[in-house]
Structures are given as C-alpha cells and as structure tokens.
Amino acid sequence: MAKKSIVQRNLRRIKLCDQYGEKRERLKSIINNKNIPIGERFAAQNKLIKELPRDSSKIRIRNRCALTGRPRGVYRKFGLCRIVLRGLCSFGKIPGITKSSW
C-alpha cells in the first residue's frame, strides 16, 4: 500500500490538471506558434510559469493502482497493478478475463 498522502497528492494533481488544462493548452499553443511575434510568445511563457500551478501539468500525474496506490506495473485498461489484477482474475472477479490454458 502506498501512503495515503501520496495518493491524495496525485488526486489533487489530477484535479488541477482538469481545472487548468484548457488554459495551459492555449498558452502552450501560443508559445509553440512560430508565426506569433517573439515578445508575445515570451509573455505567454511568463504567464504560464507565474500564473499556473506547477502541479497542473499532465506530466506530473502518476498512474496508480485504484485499490493499492502502487505506482508501478499498472495496466491502464483496468487501472489496477499487475498483482491485484492477477488476484482478481484468478478469482473470476473481472468479467471476460479467464486464465489461459492449452
């Protein structure tokens, strides 16, 4: 189990990313557009750094297991880590997944 504080921090980052995502994308498009004058691009970059929280960036979000909070070995399709997924699959808790045999 991951510490509750770390899981909560990640949830806060997800919420901030949803809240500021649109504004961040607009500023990033201005910064990366070569047709806009350099002064405006620098102003947009300054605004991005000063006004938006650092945690509102998508890159700071970590995929974590929904049950344990484990940060590694997480399957995106299920939102579970490999250990929990294997346990749930072996007990038949996930529909459509069966142990292979040949």
From Swiss-Prot:
Sections of the chain in a coiled coil: none
Keywords of the record: Ribonucleoprotein, Ribosomal protein, RNA-binding, rRNA-binding
Disulfide bonds: none
InterPro entries per record: Ribosomal_uS14 (IPR001209), Ribosomal_uS14_bac/plastid (IPR023036), Ribosomal_uS14_CS (IPR018271)
One Gene Ontology term from the biological process aspect of the record: translation
GO cellular component, one term: small ribosomal subunit
Keyword Cytoplasm on entry: no
Annotated Pfam families: Ribosomal_S14 (PF00253)
Domain of life of the source: Bacteria
Gene Ontology terms for molecular function: rRNA binding; structural constituent of ribosome
Oligomer and partners: Part of the 30S ribosomal subunit. Contacts proteins S3 and S10.
Function field: Binds 16S rRNA, required for the assembly of 30S particles and may also be responsible for determining the conformation of the 16S rRNA at the A site.
Entry's family note: Belongs to the universal ribosomal protein uS14 family.
PANTHER family: 30S RIBOSOMAL PROTEIN S14, SMALL RIBOSOMAL SUBUNIT PROTEIN US14M
Protein name stated in the entry: Small ribosomal subunit protein uS14
